[in-house]
């Protein structure tokens, strides 16, 4: 999957990111079982989606590989609000993006600076920096 890198499941920790069923997620719970008589150690991950509020679970051996999304955090200025879309200008590259209006971020207005991230080709506003 583009925009990801493979890592071993055993190296992941709570709070890190993983792609489960092509959905980028943040790990919220993780349990490791010890190796037994008939096999290696297993990991059970519980994760919440970054873009949709969905709960995902994954079980696998600690030596198996999983994709981790490459997350790019950036700052931008709100140019306009068009219904449920926010038009943002990136403050480094001056590119213009249209990002869905977040539900969990306080009131957003034109001219505000916001922090957003890009993962697996999708964007999300995370917080308002200045008003």
From Swiss-Prot:
InterPro entries: IF5A-like (IPR001884), IF5A-like_N (IPR048670), NA-bd_OB-fold (IPR012340), Rib_uL2_dom2 (IPR014722), Trans_elong_IF5A_hypusine_site (IPR019769), Transl_elong_IF5A_arc (IPR022847), Transl_elong_IF5A_C (IPR020189), Translation_prot_SH3-like_sf (IPR008991). It is found in: Cytoplasm. The keyword Kinase does not apply. GO terms for molecular function: ribosome binding; RNA binding; translation elongation factor activity; translation initiation factor activity. GO terms for biological process: positive regulation of translational elongation; positive regulation of translational termination. SUPFAM superfamilies: Nucleic acid-binding proteins (SSF50249), Translation proteins SH3-like domain (SSF50104). The keyword Cytoplasm applies. The modification Hypusine is found at residue 37. Pfam families: IF5A-like_N (PF21485). Keywords: Cytoplasm, Hypusine, Initiation factor, Protein biosynthesis. One of its GO terms (cellular component) is cytoplasm. Gene3D superfamilies: 2.30.30.30, Nucleic acid-binding proteins (2.40.50.140). Functions by promoting the formation of the first peptide bond. Belongs to the eIF-5A family. HAMAP family: eIF_5A. NCBIfam families: eIF_5A, PRK03999.1. This is Translation initiation factor 5A. The gene is eIF5A.
């Amino acid at each position: 999957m583009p925009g990801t890198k493979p890592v071993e499941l055993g190296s992941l920790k709570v709070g890190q990111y993983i792609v489960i069923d092509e959905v980028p997620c943040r790990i919220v719970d993780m349990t490791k079982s010890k190796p037994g008589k008939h096999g290696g150690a297993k990991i059970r991950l519980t994760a919440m989606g970054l873009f949709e509020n969905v709960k995902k679970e994954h079980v696998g051996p600690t030596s198996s590989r999983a994709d981790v999304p490459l997350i790019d955090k950036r700052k931008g200025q709100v140019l306009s609000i068009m219904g449920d879309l926010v038009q943002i200008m990136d403050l480094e590259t001056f590119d213009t993006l249209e990002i869905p209006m977040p539900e969990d971020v306080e009131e957003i207005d034109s001219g505000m600076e916001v922090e957003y991230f890009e993962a697996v080709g999708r964007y999300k506003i995370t917080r308002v920096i200045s008003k």
